[in-house]
Amino acid sequence: HATRNTLARNRMLARLTEATEQGTLLATHDNTELMWLRRHVGTDDIAEPEPYLFCFKHDWDALTLTERVLRTIKGLAEFHPDWAFWGYDAALLWGLEVPNDLLGPRYLVKTGCSVPLSAGCRLLRPQAAGVLEQVDGVQVTSFWRTVEDCLLRAPFSYGLAIADSALRAKGVSRDDFCERLRIDCEGKHGHRRAQVIASYADGMSENGGESRFRAFFIAYGFPVPELQVEFRDPLDPSQVFRVDYFWQLEDGTCVIGELDGKVKYTLQNGEGRESVDPFVAERQRESHLTMLGHKVLRFTFDELKNPGKLVEKMRLAGIPRRPDLAEEWRRRWYGR
């Protein structure tokens, strides 16, 4: 009996390990396995984050929200092979930037399967989903259909993060993107706002945080900065700094904007790239950028929660706010 229990335990732990290595949750239809796993939830470092889906607790606790959602979707697809995903869920599978605030209920294409409406799922009829594709073994709406579905319902700053990442992934121009939206989405609910988002999209934006700050600049009437401008280190021309935002104002003043938490530098030596302590590199880079004679303005993500204070910070940095630009954005976004 003890030997049988040990074999069962080793088999299940091996299956959990395999699921972890594959970036998914363990899904099982086997009642014996299910009973064993549920007996050991809370012990043996096993968790059941979704019904019938299991993983190691220490691994789950270490994941970001995005990683948790991705593993959940893959586990659900394993458990329900006839399920397909759209909207923000599909966007994650396609590798798009989906802000955490948009990650909640599942976005399911109703393919004749039994979907628990009580779970708050967002359902889409198959005939409305278009041609489905497979990404990492999961059925999802096509890339551009996914982007369009997201922009039709996303708030401005979140939608801009998704749109920027779509342009970055596919290398298409903003004009081509807007034309695609016009052809595919004209007449649909949310089309006008989707077009507003697309009209500001920029594939040079490297992540969702950068996109959301740019959305703030746009909505509050500040000039839109250049993105990912490169500077040579004045003390060491072999080192290149790439900054998040760069404003060149009418009076000739230049302001560099940096979103905290991301170090962008390339240090070359005889063998190629050399690693540098990130904290030291961040401080060194900032001090060297100031030697170029430019102001350096640092942003933290929490500042988006207090737009009034952020407006004042921009004013003190000398970046002019134009009420007419803010009004133009409000008119386009709200339709008045």
PLM features: residue spans?
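Surface segments flanking catalytic/ligand-binding clefts of nucleic-acid enzymes
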Residues: 3-19, 24-32, 167-336
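Short gly/ser-rich loop at a beta-strand->alpha-helix junction or flexible surface loop bordering the NTP-binding
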Residues: 1-190, 321-322, 327-336
